[in-house]
């Protein structure tokens, strides 16, 4: 398009897309955990291979994410991990929702499940005993994260999230009363519970420009791009709160270098954290300019003024006011003299670059039933307790969680690229590549919110990938629990009805 200086239309069929698109998730781990007799983690060792495909466009982003999340929300004083990035003749590996994190959580959660079984400790209790305490933060894990800076968890309060998920799913009641009754009726029902963390809001920076126009409308320009994450809603809310206007009075431009030169991008659950804080900072500066000018015009101290409904008004005398549009005009005098150093207009540009990311966390729990004949699953209940810091918009957050869980279900039990020994893709169509539909989703996702502020000004953390990260480990735990009388160990994801049938037959043949 740039060479021809004209729009280009690209068309490819589904098979071409399967062959030419990117892939992610394939890793092979050899992991060991050392625990005391009371279930305390003493050490974790892991060596793994990471399949990067034909070449490596993202460096070590994915395996570093895996290594950092392999410690989960737990205190692990002794940790070693060695990774080899392997080139194969498959599609290239790029970050996909979760981006190496689900694999790390899968490793530590599976090891804890095996330890709990060997020590005869309740699966919730063994996790509770190893969680990092609230006074441990900021917690430096002494390893390098995807940005090649120390992996520091800024804030956390993990035990209440675990307890809340266990309470919402009715963990103890199910295990002691419901599950024995259902099993006596011949039903294979299982329960799982999985804590997790998600590094979000990574650098290097984002910027924003906020301008009050003479119409009273607010223009915002930011370099971050958007692909449907409701940035327009969230960013408008951030500015509207600072400037005392309705979100409908805000016009937002994203990802246009003609409007704003500098930006990094939408990835790693960073939009609301990094760009959001840049917008907040710019809007705060503009708010200060508004109050300073209005104080002069209204002859009232700034601390006695308030911004509301597009007006600046005296707190105890609301009829004494001036509109933002009028102030914007006064801030841009066309004649006369101004004091040296005066900046025209009600406008500001600000940037935000975090020292380290904002680490979200949560706990998911699930009850499912396995059909012993077909190995099809039915999710009976699904609970997601999420802590993404200060929630800007609950509907946006819940939409992200729902979408993430849907993708996690696909990662856990349906979606897998099958290759033959020559690297030929065997299921390059939606007739053969399984994806979850509405029928495979839980009838209802019960969401519990917690709000542990992060260290940035807004107190926000990302949530775009949180729904996906714990799901594979959660499925493995719940399926094993459902098939309690078969004594299987699930060591891989994704599964499928066919693959689960094969695993059961492999166990029976031993």
Regions found by a protein language model. Give the residues of each.
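Cofactor-binding beta-sheet edge motifs in enzyme active sites
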Residues: 1-160, 167, 172-510
């Amino acid at each position: 398009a740039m060479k021809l200086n004209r729009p280009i239309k690209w068309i490819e069929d589904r098979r071409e897309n399967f062959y030419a698109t990117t892939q992610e998730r394939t890793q092979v781990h050899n992991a060991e955990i050392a625990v005391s007799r009371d279930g305390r983690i003493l050490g974790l060792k892991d060596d793994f291979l990471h399949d990067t495909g034909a070449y490596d466009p993202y460096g070590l982003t994915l395996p570093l994410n895996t290594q950092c999340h392999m410690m989960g929300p737990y205190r692990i004083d002794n940790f070693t991990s060695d990774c080899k990035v392997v080139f194969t003749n498959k599609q290239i590996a790029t970050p996909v929702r979760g981006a190496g994190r689900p694999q790390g959580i899968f490793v530590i959660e599976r090891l804890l499940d095996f330890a709990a079984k060997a020590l005869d400790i309740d699966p919730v209790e063994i996790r509770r005993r190893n969680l990092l305490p609230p006074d441990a933060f900021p917690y430096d894990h002494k390893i390098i994260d995807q940005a090649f800076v120390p992996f520091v968890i800024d804030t956390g309060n993990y035990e209440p999230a675990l307890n809340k998920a266990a309470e919402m799913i009715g963990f103890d009641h199910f295990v002691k009363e419901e599950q024995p009754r259902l099993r006596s009726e011949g039903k294979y029902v299982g329960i799982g519970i999985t804590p997790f963390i998600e590094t979000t809001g990574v650098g290097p920076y984002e910027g924003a420009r906020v301008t009050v126009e003479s119409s009273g409308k607010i223009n915002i320009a930011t370099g971050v791009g958007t692909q449907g994450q409701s940035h327009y809603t969230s960013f408008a809310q951030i500015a509207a709160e600072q400037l005392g206007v309705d979100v409908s009075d805000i016009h937002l431009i994203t990802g246009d270098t003609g409007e704003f030169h500098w930006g990094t991008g939408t990835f790693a659950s960073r939009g609301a954290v990094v760009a959001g804080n840049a917008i907040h900072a710019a809007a705060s500066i503009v708010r200060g300019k508004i109050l300073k000018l209005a104080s002069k015009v209204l002859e009232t101290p700034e601390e006695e003024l308030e911004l509301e409904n597009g007006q600046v008004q005296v707190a105890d005398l609301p009829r004494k006011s001036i509109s933002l549009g009028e102030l914007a005009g006064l801030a841009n005098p066309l004649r006369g003299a101004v004091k040296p150093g005066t900046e025209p207009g009600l406008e500001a540009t600000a940037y935000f670059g975090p020292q380290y990311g904002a680490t979200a966390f949560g706990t998911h729990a699930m009850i499912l039933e396995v059909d012993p004949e077909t190995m099809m699953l039915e999710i009976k209940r699904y609970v997601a307790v999420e802590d993404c810091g200060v929630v800007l918009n609950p509907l946006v957050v819940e939409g992200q969680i729902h979408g993430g869980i849907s993708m996690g279900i696909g990662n856990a039990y349906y979606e897998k690229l099958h290759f033959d020994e020559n690297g030929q893709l065997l299921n390059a169509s939606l007739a053969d590549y399984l994806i979850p539909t509405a029928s495979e989703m839980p009838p209802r996702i019960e969401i519990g919110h917690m709000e542990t502020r992060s260290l940035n000004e807004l107190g926000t953390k990302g949530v775009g990938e949180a729904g996906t990260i714990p799901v594979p480990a959660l499925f493995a735990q719940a399926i094993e629990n459902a098939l309690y009388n078969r004594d299987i160990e699930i060591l891989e994801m994704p599964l499928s009805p066919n693959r689960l049938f094969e695993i059961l037959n492999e166990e029976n043949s031993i």
